[in-house]
UniProtKB/Swiss-Prot annotation:
One of its GO terms (biological process) is methylation. The gene is aviRb. Keywords: Antibiotic resistance, Methyltransferase, S-adenosyl-L-methionine, Transferase. Homodimer. Its EC number is 2.1.1.208. It is an enzyme of class 2 (transferase). This is 23S rRNA (uridine(2479)-2'-O)-methyltransferase. It holds the Pfam family SpoU_methylase. Changing T135V: Slightly increases catalytic activity. Specifically methylates the 2'-O-ribose position of uridine-2479 in 23S ribosomal RNA. Confers resistance to antibiotic avilamycin, an orthosomycin antibiotic. The keyword Methyltransferase applies. It comes from the Bacteria.
Amino acid sequence: MARSRGERTPAARRITSRNARFQQWQALLGNRNKRTRAGEFLVMGVRPISLAVEHGWPVRTLLYDGQRELSKWARELLRTVRTEQIAMAPDLLMELGEKNEAPPEVVAVVEMPADDLDRIPVREDFLGVLFDRPTSPGNIGSIIRSADALGAHGLIVAGHAADVYDPKSVRSSTGSLFSLPAVRVPSPGEVMDWVEARRAAGTPIVLVGTDEHGDCDVFDFDFTQPTLLLIGNETAGLSNAWRTLCDYTVSIPMAGSASSLNAANAATAILYEAVRQRISGRTATTP
């Protein structure tokens, strides 16, 4: 939230030791349960923090280096974002920054949104991605980044999975986490209730799974229709439950000796084909 003109910036607190507050923030880096209980996670970097603010994510606390001259961006951030501000010793910030070569200038403590499928907008041109039981938070972040870049409307992370708000996922998304709704859902049933409700409301979403023995090649499928693309676990692929629920399955033609693509790369390739079809107006033949 930006301050109104003339409103004074609250005096910042200082933390120079590994006190209880610091330990709470440190736990957000590596403890999923504590992130979930606290309902918050850490964000660092100019673009991710700027996008979090731009898209209205509540920033609970801004931690900044109290012993260096801050950049113009950091000064403006501290001036305009109305929240708790704490000056930190640089060695403490470095620990929160996962001990990179240099401490981050600013770390934001950001509130998690509710895991509500209604956060994902559904229109007649709907294009969404479901990632089934991913084990790599980096892959989650990479798919969020690709889905955002290619105009998808949201990501569903299904089943027992890595955490959307793991630091590796947040970092891999390069800020796209804050512009693309990403929702964690425990079971296929909850997703299908949402899909069926959208179908009943007039948006005939089709579920398209990925499989090396798909019904057709990705280039021959009609992605101009409302589509939820299902990407399987990095090792096991789609679960039997999701395979059964698919309306169609598609495969990516492979050359050379590679047998498959990384899950994030596969999602990106298929999303690109979907967008290409939609831009060109091409309608392929759905089996």
